[in-house]
Amino acid sequence: MAQKDDKTKDKGVKTRRISRRTAIKTAGVLVGAGIAGVPGALTRGMSVRSAAAAEKPIKIGFQVHRTGIGAVYGRWYERTTTAAVKLINETGGIAGRPVEVVAEDDGTDPKRGAEVVEKLAVQHKVDFVYGTLFSHVVIASAPRAGELKIPMFVASEGYHVPSGTLNRYVFQPGITDVRSQTRSIVSWVLNNLGKKATMIFPDYAFGYDHRDFFGGAVREKGGTILAQLPIPPTETSFTKYFPRIPADTEVLYHVMVGPGVLTFVKEMGEHFGAKRPQIFGFIDSLEGVDMASPGLEFLEGTYFWEGLPRYSDGYPTPYEKFFRQRVGVNDEGASIQDPKDVSTYAHMFSCWETLFVIKQAVEQSGYRDRTPKDYKALIETLENFQWFNEGIQHPQGHKKFIGRIHQSFGQQFVSEVRNRRLKVVHRTKIEDSLYPTEVDYTKQPL
């Protein structure tokens, strides 16, 4: 892909113009383009709720990690989905039709993931499959979506979508991928923390993306990877891994998920004590975990990537504030109802944004039913999208969408742990994350 094709242009929505044939679609445009900059503007859609209710619902099949190692994410992905669908239905639904979510737990298990896709498509007859997160589940589920010829919208971060290894029915428009995330922050890490890095990552596809792309970017920028340590995601004790970290490590890069992440951080602190290298982690290691938890004192002065800052002062825009309020999250990143219930705030916006992308694609393509013709129109329409404006539909920020690879690119945040909180110290630009690729899903038959 030529670099000139990837230059970011903050000049409005470059998708095909939405039809204004009905008041319902007009309401969709106001929200979608970010014109509705204040929540009050959304109330204009309330009068069309009764009309939407009379239409056949659009059914979205939600492949959710209610159990297994992804359960904490699944819980907040489900809350975010509920909040987004509630807002969509309050403002006229999608193309004048109410949205109904059919959720099925995949146990964060690859085998069950493929079964869930089939159940949603064949038994529940949903229009689309949506919401899959963990990489190994996405990789196992996506081929079944392709075989069933049903669009699948994942919220995963993995490089599996833009890599071209999946199929034309799978999109990731609501969150950026690991390759772009690591590419965008690597210069900051090398310039501010050190050039000799050791990596600790989970031993499955998501971790391999970090291994390959952060490691590759470090070498490309003149740094050195001293060691790479994969750890099984179900591991519960980590003391045997830390002695393998080379003594001359300047930066320890970690990204861990699963039930043992709190133990991982505590044991890392016990191992290093005061004589530690600089530490940079992906907040995946502590999503759903209170930064003031006992044992995390060791993290003071370390750094994390965040997709969207957990604390409200990290990115205080009216759109982020509106999103935070609608999903029920307080200024500290925890549930308003239960402050001990910490959100997965750096990731869960992807559900919100993806659902609004589905809304735009349906309305602009004229999609009505589960027919090959309508699916073709929807897929081709989405592949022609180029830009998602920051706004109520996209509170994390502007997104550049490259239809050939079915992937969005956006800004990232680097935060430092200060006084048991995360303080944003750096925000990347979209162009920092762009990479060359020859992938082109649009050439695959439907």
Annotate the PLM regions.
Residues A2-K7, K14-L30, V38-L446:
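Extracytosolic ligand-binding ectodomains
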